[in-house]
Amino acid sequence: MSTIRECIMGMKVGSKMKKEKISIIVPCYNEEESLPIFYEEITKIAEEMKKVEFEFIFINDGSKDNTLNIIKDLRKKDDRVRFISFSRNFGKEGGMYAGLEYATGDFVAIMDADMQDPPSMIKEMYHAIKEEGYDCVALCSPKHKDYGLVRKIFTKCWYKLIGKISSTPQVPGARDFRLMKRKVVDAIVNMKEYNRYSKGLFS
């Protein structure tokens, strides 16, 4: 009996707990200027979150500039970088869903490469999921402060229209930048609908 107990104790001491992984999905269309800056910032956050593993999934959505070559160069120097490249532009929704299917993380984030989504928010979003029990945490733009008058009116009308034709309440100002648990990602990927509206699914 004592021998068995010693073996169990030895296993506990000697074994390492597997780190949780966050997959960062980054849809890219003609982002040659912003990609190096984004990569530098997001890898800084990854270094700060030492207890978590990361993978960075860049989706080249038929870019006409040097985006794909930059992604390939990042892949050569960082094995955490993975990518999908489309021969033509399928739109952001298509890129996001391709990334969701490709991601292997326990948590999955979607964010833009243009730095409108602060990479530093990943830490706070992860904390909210881990400590406060949320399944999905999203960033919102407060009252569209940076929008011009025409865009503000259009945006308001858009949300009213979607609210009328959808049974799911829409959150005005909700962005695509969000962090989700694996079970949320799996539920979305398992949906078979061809035309999916991401903000409606995430609401």
Please state what every model-predicted region is.
Residues 5-44, 51:
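N-proximal low-complexity "stem/linker" segments adjacent to membrane-targeting elements
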Residues 60-68, 115-116:
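A conserved acidic beta->alpha catalytic loop
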